[in-house]
Amino acid sequence: LAEIKSALELALEKAERYGRATKEELTREKYRDQGRQLAVDFLKDGGDLDAAFSSLPAAAQVEARGAIKEVLLRNITLPRNGEMDPRMAQALEGLLSVAQDQKAMSRQKAELEQILQNFLQVRNNAYQQLKARFGAGIGQMQRALEAQMHQKVKLEVEHLPQFQEEWRKFQGQLLDQFERILEACKEKMLSL
């Protein structure tokens, strides 16, 4: 209940501050909202983000650029199931199109893509090694079960609870390690 109350208090404080916002702050927030909407539309429908961004008034572009980058960067994550999310490539292209320093953003994009490739390679290698390690002992386990049940049994390494537990543990450590690297790269991209 204390958390709910404190969250409510925070919301009330924010509403109070918002009520006292200057005209400049309201205008900046309006531009940020426009930027967020451009990014969402770009991710949803594709389209020409550069043209949409260029159509904004010059005064709006600074705030909108920051908001666009924030939305696009939120769509760049480590692949959870071993495959890249197709929206990630689109988000990277969008970042490149709104960057103030195109060359630096291009370098960061290449670095980020390398991080993602390294993550997938380490993940896949570890999965195969773990599978081979458990596979070595599965034959003996399978024979013991067949003797116990008096029928043929087919065991899949990936379905063993011990394998799944080991894999979850390793994957959690791997995600922690690569998330920090990815976040540092995304911070750099936000500033470009």
Enumerate the predicted regions with their spans.
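Long amphipathic alpha-helical segments with strong coiled-coil/leucine-zipper propensity
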Residues: R36-Y127
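Intrinsically disordered or highly flexible coil/loop and linker segments, enriched in small
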Residues: A21-E24, K44, D48, Q121, ...
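Alpha-helical oligomerization segments
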Residues: Q148-L192
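Non-transmembrane, amphipathic alpha-helical segments
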Residues: K23, T27, A104, Q108-E111, ...
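Amphipathic protein-protein interaction modules
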Residues: L120-L160
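Leu/Val/Ala/Ile-rich N-terminal alpha-helices, chiefly Sec-type signal peptides and the beginnings
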Residues: L1-A60
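Long, low-complexity intrinsically disordered regions enriched in acidic and polar residues
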Residues: K30, K44-A51, A60-A67, E158-Q173
